[in-house]
């Protein structure tokens, strides 16, 4: 498959296309794989993301900046970038990895993303690698909230519900798919008090729970204003109903 579309998404045309091919090559495919490029890309990525955070959040201290960076460069965040780049269709995997669904495995996607950053550094130097990384991370940073740094979706949902004195969510595995070594899980997250039930998939039970919690949190945040309006309406109605009784008591 042509790499031209991927290069457009990266906003970099490789002078040495072999570097990009190597970045997409898993060790199960050939001896010239991407692990050394991944090592290099990891170092460049950490520096560039640290600089981006330093500029964007001038009031955050070192501890908060470190936690935020760790959250942005972790495997799940890199795998999300890999999915957005549609790397699955470009990965070069051995037969065993192909059969086991390695092209969608978060660890393989994340490693390939870091390897691409390393390849960009070797192909065009630091400025090129920085441009490639910034392009991928700008939309991520635009939605970053320092108040939630380092907290996963389940923790955020729990804090949201506890802050409103609501019962904690219930997580249930509703389905599993695939062979034992490459199972996909579907988990339901239910919040009875808000009449919310959502289902999300994941490569592990934990990943599916996190995805379901994220959907449930979004639904709960959307439902909260409407719930508050309903409560105000009920309180107003109760006050109106009690008014004639109060008047009657005064007349007596």
From Swiss-Prot:
Q: Which cofactor does it need?
A: Mg(2+)
Reaction catalysed? Endonucleolytic cleavage to 5'-phosphomonoester
Q: Which residues bind Mg(2+)?
A: 38, 111, 114
Keyword Isomerase in annotation? no
Q: Where in the cell is it found?
A: Cytoplasm
Q: Which PROSITE patterns match?
A: DS_RBD, RNASE_3_1, RNASE_3_2
Q: Where is the active site?
A: 42, 114
Concerning Pfam families, the annotation shows: dsrm, Ribonucleas_3_3
Superkingdom of this protein's organism: Bacteria
What GO biological process terms does the UniProt entry carry, in alphabetical order?
Answer: mRNA processing; regulation of gene expression; rRNA processing; tRNA processing
What's the family? Belongs to the ribonuclease III family.
Q: Which PANTHER family match?
A: RIBONUCLEASE 3 (PTHR11207:SF0), RIBONUCLEASE III (PTHR11207)
Q: What is this protein called?
A: Ribonuclease 3
């Amino acid at each position: 498959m042509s790499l031209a579309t991927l290069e457009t998404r990266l906003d970099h045309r490789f002078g040495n296309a072999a570097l990009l091919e190597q970045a997409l090559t898993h060790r199960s495919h050939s001896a010239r794989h991407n692990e050394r490029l991944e090592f290099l890309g990891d170092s460049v990525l950490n520096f560039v993301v640290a600089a981006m955070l330093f500029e964007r959040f001038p009031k955050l201290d070192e501890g908060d900046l470190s936690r935020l960076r760790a959250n942005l460069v972790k495997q799940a965040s890199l795998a999300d970038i890999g999915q957005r780049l549609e790397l699955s269709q470009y990965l070069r995997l051995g037969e065993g990895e192909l059969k086991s669904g390695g092209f969608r495995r978060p660890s393989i996607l994340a490693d390939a993303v870091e390897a691409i950053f390393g390849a960009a550094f070797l192909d065009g130097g630091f400025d090129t690698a920085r441009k490639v990384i910034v392009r991928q991370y700008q939309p991520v940073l635009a939605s970053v909230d320092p108040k939630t740094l380092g907290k996963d979706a389940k923790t955020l949902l729990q804090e949201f519900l506890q802050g409103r004195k609501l019962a904690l969510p219930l997580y249930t595995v509703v389905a599993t798919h695939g062979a034992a070594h490459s199972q996909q899980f579907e988990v339901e997250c239910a919040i009875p008090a808000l009449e919310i039930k959502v289902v999300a998939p994941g490569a592990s039970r934990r990943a599916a729970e996190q995805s379901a919690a994220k959907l449930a949190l979004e639904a709960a945040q959307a439902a909260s204003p409407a719930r508050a309006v309903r409560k105000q309406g009920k309180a107003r109605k109760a006050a109106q109903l009690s008014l004639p009784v109060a008047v009657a008591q005064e007349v007596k």
